[in-house]
Regions:
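Short alpha-helix boundary/capping and kink motifs at helix termini
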Residues: 2, 7-8, 13-23, 28-104
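A short, basic-hydrophobic beta/loop patch
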Residues: 87-147
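Primarily interfacial, aromatic-capped hydrophobic alpha-helices that serve as membrane anchors
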Residues: 147-154
Length: 154
């Protein structure tokens, strides 16, 4: 999708458009975990996904080639208010925020991508009514564990 096409849809071309979609990595050492069935997430803090199909694509590539993107973009052009509303119909997007970085954990990759672009130019970057799991990991323990594994024979 060209800059002009993105600008036509969202009024601006966000800085992250050519950033790669990151991988949600599991951690062996979790300090805390919380869950909320109806949360609001800052779409500016969404960096990636658990879905291997989209990992490594840029946000621009995903906007252009996502499996259900055309259908979701058509819905967006008819009803952009969906992305501003506190109400959700159907299955809400499911996010995991791990150590402050957001990832689409299950459902909602296409909607999250559109929300990330659309809400970038809005007064509030918050997407409401989503499922959310927040995880804080112990990076120090993860590092120690990795170092210890390297010391052990194969």
């Amino acid at each position: 999708m060209t800059d002009n096409q993105i600008r036509e849809l969202f009024d601006t071309v966000p800085f992250f458009v050519d950033n790669p979609i990151e991988v949600l990595r599991s951690s062996r050492f979790i300090r805390s975990m919380s869950h909320c069935d109806s949360a609001s997430v800052n779409t500016g803090l969404i960096y990636g996904t658990a879905n291997p199909v989209y990992q490594g694509m840029t946000w621009r590539e995903f906007l252009s080639h996502g499996k259900k993107m055309k259908k979701n973009l058509d819905r967006f052009t008819v009803n952009p208010e969906y992305y501003l509303s506190h109400e959700r119909s159907g299955t809400p997007p499911f996010f995991c925020f791990q150590d402050g970085k957001g990832y689409v954990a299950e459902d909602g990759n296409h909607r999250a991508c559109i929300a990330k672009f659309f809400l970038y130019a809005q007064p509030s970057p918050l997407l409401h009514g989503v499922h959310l799991v927040e995880v804080q990991t112990d990076a120090r323990m993860e590092n120690l564990f990795s170092r210890l594994k390297r010391l052990l024979p194969p």
